[in-house]
């Protein structure tokens, strides 16, 4: 009797985890309606400079770019994910200047973006108090630079 009860409890738990993961995927913003040229202008005028400042003292060949994107909405999805979702070894880049400017550009030039991000922002309020730039964060920002370069290529498909 015990193995069946345990099996039932585990199946219910895994079902709940699966549903939570599915909800997370559904809540991802769709960047297809963004004004890509305005976002590109914001990147070229300010965000790129802040990324370079963050990476100052780091050799560009130090990290391999493993994250890629196929079109502009996909690039923005990857940029948003790397910038605002904490990863192992890099708690969060969300308070960095380039991240704040990225968020502002997306909120201004992507209809409805700021409303969909309210819950995600509230969930990330627990942050480290002291600022530590780890090697993992530098690698992540290097990935962001590559994604932004890909986003800005003139022949990249819009969708």
From Swiss-Prot:
GO terms for molecular function: cytokine activity; interleukin-7 receptor binding. The keyword Secreted applies. Transmembrane segments: none annotated. Disulfide bonds join 34-110, 69-75, 90-137. Keywords: Cytokine, Disulfide bond, Glycoprotein, Secreted, Signal. The keyword Nucleotidyltransferase does not apply. GO terms for biological process: antimicrobial humoral immune response mediated by antimicrobial peptide; cell surface receptor signaling pathway via JAK-STAT; cytokine-mediated signaling pathway; defense response to fungus; defense response to Gram-negative bacterium; interleukin-7-mediated signaling pathway; negative regulation of apoptotic process; positive regulation of cell population proliferation. It holds the Pfam family TSLP. Interacts with a receptor composed of CRLF2 and IL7R. Binding of TSLP to CRLF2/TSLPR is a mechanistic prerequisite for recruitment of IL7R to the high-affinity ternary complex. This is Thymic stromal lymphopoietin. It comes from Homo sapiens (Human). The lineage of its organism: Eukaryota, Metazoa, Chordata, Craniata, Vertebrata.
